[in-house]
Design a protein with these regions (language model features):
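Intrinsic-disorder-associated interaction segments
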Residues: 5-8, 31-35, 90, 111, ...
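Short secondary-structure capping/junction motifs at helix and strand boundaries
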Residues: 2, 18, 110-111, 165, ...
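Catalytic cores of extracellular degradative/oxidative enzymes
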Residues: 33, 56, 63, 167, ...
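Bacterial Sec-dependent N-terminal signal peptides
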Residues: 1-23
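Aromatic-lined, polymer-binding surfaces characteristic
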Residues: 40-217
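Extended polysaccharide-engagement surfaces of secreted carbohydrate-active enzymes
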Residues: 221-314
């Protein structure tokens, strides 16, 4: 038993040292800047220090173009290759690519040679399990966040390329219709019943896709519902965070996310509420919201940092 306790203590100390060594961003326990200043600070921080590979690599490129820096070829090609590999969770990356494409419509930020690759990737993507093409690797479609990731990506892709024929034979208009029916149900269920993955690390994912819908969905009802559900999610985090940590129950969580000095949503709480740290790889929501029209209601921001009043949440 002593041996087990000793090993456990050493593991925790090692983990804490790793966290401290990695940290390039100050952990805030109280807000020190306005929401707009935090957005600017985060984009600059992540453009310089953010991860350029794996599932969230394309979001580093969003941060770069948002502050006026050029996109980089190699990380973008890696992101395209990852999506085309048909691996699980490539729906994270495709949503980042779509935000880039919509940003490019407002102001040219994607070089022509990279845009060609990204567009081909979007037109070829498998947007739902009923697409007749067989998956070559396991892909999760059914969990709460993945459902909406796929439907959001399909809606935004269909809107962009209404008259184009996708690899699966459907045109953009058909993809919009296919996604819209499923998205409306998902949004209605979240507002009526809340999240089955309540207070989980996946709020970071869901805040990102909701921001994409809020900014770019052409259907006014979907935009409005996305904003309402995003307010609901922010209120949930405001009630249950403590100085940027979600020390609550959750509908889904991995051990490595619990045994840590910060939480997957800590960059999001720092951006929205001014408490937490930007020093994590889970930044899809902060990137999306730093480049979004969405504004978190002031009353929710005030609730988020009111730690003086005891609260029982059932």
């Amino acid at each position: 038993m002593k041996h087990i306790i000793t090993v456990s203590i050493l593991f925790i100390l090692s983990l804490l040292q790793t966290i401290q060594a990695k940290g390039k961003d100050e952990y805030w326990y109280t807000p020190k800047a306005s929401p707009e200043e935090r957005k600017e600070s985060f984009l600059k921080y992540y453009a310089e220090h953010g991860r350029k590979d794996f599932l969230t690599g394309i979001f580093n490129q969003i941060a770069r173009v948002a502050i006026g820096q050029p996109m980089e070829d190699e990380p973008t090609y890696k992101a395209v290759a990852l999506v085309r590999s048909n691996r699980d969770c490539n729906d994270f990356s495709i949503n980042g690519m779509l935000r880039l494409l919509y940003m490019d419509r407002e102001k040219t930020v994607i070089p022509a040679h990279l845009k060609k690759e990204i567009e081909a990737c979007v037109l070829d993507f498998k947007y739902w399990w009923d697409d007749g093409r067989r998956d070559t690797t396991y892909r999760c479609y059914h969990t709460e966040n993945h459902q909406a990731l796929y439907h959001t990506a399909e809606l935004l892709a269909g809107q962009l390329y209404k008259d184009r024929i996708f690899t699966n034979g459907m045109n953009g208009v058909q993809h919009v219709q296919h996604a819209k029916e499923r998205l409306e149900r998902w949004l209605d269920f979240r507002f009526r019943f809340g999240f089955s993955e309540w207070l989980s690390t996946y709020y970071e994912v869901e805040a990102m896709l909701l921001a994409n819908l809020y900014d770019y969905a052409e259907d006014e009802a979907i935009r409005k519902k996305a904003g309402m559900v995003l307010d609901l999610l922010m209120f949930d985090m405001a009630l249950n965070n403590f100085e940027g940590m979600m020390g609550s129950t959750s509908g889904r969580m991995y051990a490595h996310s619990l045994i840590n000095g910060s939480h997957n949503t800590s960059p999001l709480t720092k951006l929205m509420f001014g408490v937490g740290t930007f020093d994590r790889d889970e930044v899809m929501a902060p990137i999306a919201l730093s480049t979004s029209k969405y504004q978190c209601p002031k009353v929710i921001q005030e609730i988020a940092i009111d730690y003086q009043r005891p609260m029982l949440n059932r």
